[in-house]
């Protein structure tokens, strides 16, 4: 059941040295390619990074919160073409990233994402500018997030869901505060 998979998925930032198989990576990306996009425009593209030196460099694309990428076996940059869907590219990429995270969990792999929007590189330039140079991207492309994937070297406790009655409303009126 999907709920079991959603409950199983945790943000994993520590990985073993075990390699993610090509078959697993292909399955993850095949699932991502099924992600819905607004008006089925499909502005989302994926860049796979496996080279350890490149992963180390990539882990510095923003201050502090992308360090886990250096320990991942593989990273997937979720990129959008802003000419295809300029008003929905961020949302389309977020849906695709969620599919990737769930697919990784289904394969007993660990994964988490690091967002790019409004992030700064340690040099002071935007993370987006750094990543454009890093990947040699045309201006029409935006890197939305980068997902590190590997075999988990940590276990996370079960996530306690948010309280249903405090977050779900049948009618707004004055209930939402």
What is the role of each PLM region?
Residues 1-177:
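Acidic, surface-exposed loops and disordered segments
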């Amino acid at each position: 059941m999907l709920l079991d998979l959603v409950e199983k998925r945790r943000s994993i930032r520590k990985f073993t040295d075990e390699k993610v198989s090509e078959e697993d990576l292909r399955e993850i990306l095949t699932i991502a390619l099924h992600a819905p996009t607004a008006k089925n425009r499909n502005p989302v593209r994926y860049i796979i990074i496996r080279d350890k030196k490149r992963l180390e460099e990539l882990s510095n694309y923003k201050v502090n919160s992308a360090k886990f990428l250096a320990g991942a076996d593989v990273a997937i940059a979720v990129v959008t073409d802003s000419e295809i869907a300029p008003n929905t590219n961020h949302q389309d990429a977020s849906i695709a990233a969620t599919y990737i995270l769930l697919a990784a969990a289904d394969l007993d792999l660990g994964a988490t994402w690091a967002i790019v929007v409004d992030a700064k590189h340690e040099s002071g330039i935007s993370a987006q500018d750094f990543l454009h140079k890093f990947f040699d991207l045309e201006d029409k492309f935006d890197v939305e997030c980068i997902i590190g994937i590997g075999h988990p070297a940590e276990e996370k406790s079960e996530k306690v869901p948010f309280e249903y009655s405090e977050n779900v409303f049948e009618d707004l009126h004055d209930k939402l505060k």
